[in-house]
Amino acid sequence: MVIIMSEAELKEAMKRNPHLRRYIENFKRTYMRIPDFMVSLSRELKELKYPNIIYPVGDPIFIHIFGTPETKTKYIVIEPTLETAEEKLKYKMILNKILELAPYEETPKSVEEFEEVLTRLFNACTKVTEAVGEEGFFQRIFRFADNKIKITPEERDKFLYILKRDLIGLGNLEPIGRDPYLEDIHVIGPKNCHVVHKIFGMLPTNITWEDEIELADYLKNLGERMGRPVSDANPIVDGTLPDGSRINIIYSTDVSPKGPSFTIRKFTDVPISVTQLISWGTFSTEVAAYLWLCLEYGMSIFICGETASGKTTTLNAILPFIKPNSKIFSCEDTPEVKPPHPVWQQLVTRERGPEESRVTLFDLLRAALRSRPNYIIVGEIRSVEAAVAFQAMQTGHPVLSTFHAANVRKMIQRLNGDPINVPLTFMDNLNVALFQLAVYQRGKVLRRVVSIEEIEGYYKEVDGVVTRAVFQWEPDKDRHVFTGRNNSYVLEEKIAKAAGYEDPRDIYNELELRARILEEMIAREIFDYYQVRDIIWAFYEKGLEGLPFPI
């Protein structure tokens, strides 16, 4: 839902943030209009051909999305900057003084302590004064009695923000790191930073570095802070930022001729709910109800698709369908899955260090078999760990994972070929494969589940694996068709039998009931991930009586 900032709120924001006021004044002089100010955005804004929107991402940072018929839509960061030579000198002197005093402080144990120490040191070497007077240059900066650097209230806020941004935060990338509406960040050299916005797509930004040397130093610092140092000898590094976002760094100009480059896949603190994905058209209520039954009854599912198709988003969205008293075991290279269950054993690989101390996905999956989980979640299956995953399925441990494949034929080819090498006769241990793609339609990039396939098994007569499509997406009508109604192998032969139905086709009534529950949540605009989870779990505990609405 779009929430527009009131005039009073806008005036207050400009009063708190003089840099915002100056930006708007300059913009108005140039374009003879002012942007629309919004507290929050909605996907409806995607219809705007030439957006002119400013929204906050936490004081003192604002984002301006602006396009005209003559210029491409841009992503403009509005933040405090050092504007004059005097400000730059003051800031440099303050930073040097802080670095001189820092060794005498105890090492902070948390970000909060780091901020406290930094603020204390900043206050120790500065003095805020309203008037600068008519003194000379150095007299304006120093009050010689206490050797403190004289600064104005606006400079205090500005310098503290820049210090915390550069020493504690993400430096140049701090503003876009805070933006909840971003999916990816792409930097190729010091002057080329683009973002993928959840509403407006790929946009160029005004974020730059002075030159390749400054960008290389920035990436070195980032790598050290992640515990994944980069160098010419180790130019390609994958890591995780403090907020959980994934980053891939390509450091050396020998490998990246346009200059050091990197890509960040933004991490969402609270996962997107299944009802939200349904409302966006990613899949239908029937698809979600089918997945609900599959997870309720311990089916193994692969969420398949190409890069940036939304596989992990869908995986996280459907996790509340797993019963609340289940033990979840997750193993990943980079932590991304977030089961909302109280008994969740989260493990990640360790790729650095001596060979004998490294821990691979293969190692973690072997450990999973000894941990007695109800569900095993693998971030992404790419190699020999697939053999252990299929072994887990064989021994009654359902497995959820993402997998790179555009359709069921390519999925089976990848699983059966090098380096994975799962025998065709083992394929029926996997019950369901969901295929999701990013599709370009009517000038927009949409994420859609394009099909769901059930794996029946290997048949010697056809010398291949037989699969059955139960859902298909019709692109011309943008709808999902339940082609497996009264013809689903998994629902009738697996789930209905496990549920004890005399007539296996009664399982479709259960599917329709769950679809109605999801439809009612959407009608009531229940999109919060944890609210959706609570309703699903209340249904598990008390049936229809546990729901906060009639069905």
From Swiss-Prot:
Give the matching InterPro entries.
P-loop_NTPase, T2SS/T4SS_dom, T4SS_GSP_E_ATPase
Matches recorded under CDD domains: VirB11-like_ATPase
Q: Which Pfam families match?
A: T2SSE (PF00437)
Q: Which GO terms describe its molecular function?
A: ATP hydrolysis activity
Similarity remark? Belongs to the GSP E family.
Q: What is this protein called?
A: Uncharacterized protein MJ0900
Organism, as annotated: Methanocaldococcus jannaschii (strain ATCC 43067 / DSM 2661 / JAL-1 / JCM 10045 / NBRC 100440) (Methanococcus jannaschii)
